[in-house]
Design a protein with these regions (language model features):
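Short SAM/SAH-binding signature in class I
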Residues: 162-168
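Structured loop/turn residues at beta-strand edges in well-structured enzyme cores
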Residues: 5, 48, 94, 118, ...
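Conserved acidic residues
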Residues: 8, 142-143, 165
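Short, well-ordered coil/turn residues at beta-beta hairpins
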Residues: 13, 168-170
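Short amphipathic alpha-helix with an adjacent loop that forms part of the alpha/beta core around
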Residues: 150-162
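NAD(P)H dinucleotide-binding glycine-rich loop of Rossmann-like/cofactor-binding domains
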Residues: 20-102
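Mid-domain Rossmann-like dinucleotide-binding core that forms the NAD(H)/NADP(H) cofactor-binding site
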Residues: 64-149, 153
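Glycine-rich beta-strand-centered segment in the early N-terminal region that forms part
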Residues: 1-24, 66-68
Length: 170
C-alpha cells in the first residue's frame, strides 16, 4: 500500500476493486471481475466494522480523512453518503429532471442530498413511514414526500411525460 501510511485515518470503500478490469476502467467498480473485487468486505472478508481489517486493493479503496473532520462526520463517507453520491452520479440526473427516491432511511436521505446537487426540477421521495416523510418535509422542503398510495399520482403530476427520469431504490 502506497497511497496511505500507518496511522492515517481512512474511510474504506464498501467495495474492493482492482482498477484494471473492463468495469473498473469505466468507473463501475461494483462490477469488478477480480476474485477479490466487488462486495468482499463484510461478505467474503470479515472485519468491515472492526478496528483493523485487511483491505484488498487498498490503494484504490481507501480515502484519507482530512484533519478537522471528526470521526462522527467521517462515518457517513464510507458507505451511506458514498452510496447516495454514486447513485446520483450514475443516475445521470439533468437540470429539470423528475427524480424518484424509494425509501427515506439514512441512505435515501443521503441520495436525496446528492441528487439535489444536480438541480433536478422535482424530487419525489416515497416512504411508507409517516415519521420519515415528516423528516423529509422538514429536512428538504423542496422535495415532495409521499406515501406508497400517492406515488403514482405524484409522479404523473410532477413530470412532463408522466414518469420519472431517474429512480433510486435505496
Amino acid at each position: 500500500v502506497t497511497a496511505v501510511r500507518p496511522g492515517d485515518r481512512v474511510a474504506v470503500n464498501v467495495e474492493t476493486f482492482c482498477g484494471r478490469c473492463f468495469f473498473c476502467e469505466r468507473g463501475y467498480v461494483n462490477n469488478c471481475t477480480d476474485p477479490n473485487g466487488g462486495w468482499a468486505l463484510g461478505c467474503r472478508i470479515d472485519g468491515g466494522q472492526a478496528a483493523f481489517v485487511r483491505v484488498p486493493y487498498a490503494n484504490q479503496g481507501l480515502t484519507r480523512i482530512p484533519e478537522g473532520v471528526s470521526d462522527r462526520k467521517a462515518l457517513l463517507v464510507g458507505d451511506v453518503l458514498a452510496t447516495g453520491f454514486w447513485a446520483a452520479r450514475i443516475g445521470e440526473i439533468h437540470p429539470g429532471d423528475t427524480v424518484m427516491i424509494l425509501g427515506a432511511g439514512p441512505t435515501g436521505l443521503c441520495t436525496l442530498l446528492c441528487d439535489l446537487l444536480h438541480a433536478p426540477g422535482r424530487v419525489i421521495v416515497c416512504e411508507k413511514d409517516p415519521q420519515r416523510r415528516a423528516f423529509v418535509r422538514a429536512f428538504a422542503p423542496q422535495a415532495l414526500a409521499v406515501g406508497p398510495e400517492e406515488v403514482v399520482e405524484a409522479v404523473r403530476a410532477n413530470s412532463a411525460h408522466g414518469g420519472a427520469d431517474a429512480v433510486f431504490e435505496v
